[in-house]
Amino acid sequence: MDLDEKLKKAQRLEKKSYYISEYLFRVLIIQKFILLPLAKTPITPNFITILSAIFAALSFYFIYLGHFICAGLLFLVYSLLDHIDGMLARYKNLSSKIGKLLDVSVDNLTFNGIFIFLFFCDLISLQACIFALVSMNIYNCITTFYILNQLRKLKSIKRFGLKKWFLDRGFLLGIDASLLAILISAGIMLGAFELMCYVVGGIFLFDLCYRLIAVSYTHL
């Protein structure tokens, strides 16, 4: 089996449900135009992860300089590379504990660091910074250590409302790393830093409440 066939087979085994923003990044951009050519090169997933960290740092630097459009675009490139490294690792069977640790570390530093950096640049208030950071990290902790554990115990989960409508069509409605990056990038490019913090924090809290209700509803 040649590389093209191997990758196409792997693509068919990819999960069928995507977050909408994740579908845009993974399926419409990376799988269509980037993954196959990149997989034929000696470039490693860890190199892509390090490259993503460089683009994130450049985004921070351009924020400091006041070049917000460039900073927002660089942050989008970081997010795209963040998707590419994991997909490349799976397709080339190069997944490793070190790679996973590196990827998670870069993501945590970038997504937490951006709000802290904006505060120290006097672009957002302390309240907005804390709201975004607390909402994001509470969401991550509860979904990782409680909700996902509950889902593993259930054969299925009862969803309702708009999320059910999207799921029936193969899409997950909620916030993920790609949507978070898009919101941050848009906020940077528009210079709407304070609003971006409250929008991001609000979406995290709303999505968390929905997921907790869905888990409780399933147990009934």
Regions found by a protein language model. Give the residues of each.
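Conserved small/polar residues in nucleotide/adenosyl-binding loops
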Residues: T218-H219
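Membrane-helix boundary/juxtamembrane motif in polytopic membrane proteins
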Residues: L151-I175
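Transit-peptide-like, low-complexity N-terminal presequences
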Residues: M1-Q31
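Membrane-embedded alpha-helical segments that form the functional core of polytopic membrane enzymes
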Residues: P45-I98, M196
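Membrane-water interface of transmembrane alpha-helices
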Residues: C141-K155
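Basic, amphipathic juxtamembrane/active-site segments
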Residues: G86-Q127
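Helix-coil boundary and interhelical linker segments in multi-pass alpha-helical membrane proteins
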Residues: F60-C70, G113-A132, I188-C197
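Core segments of transmembrane alpha-helices
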Residues: S52-A56, D107-F115, L172-A186
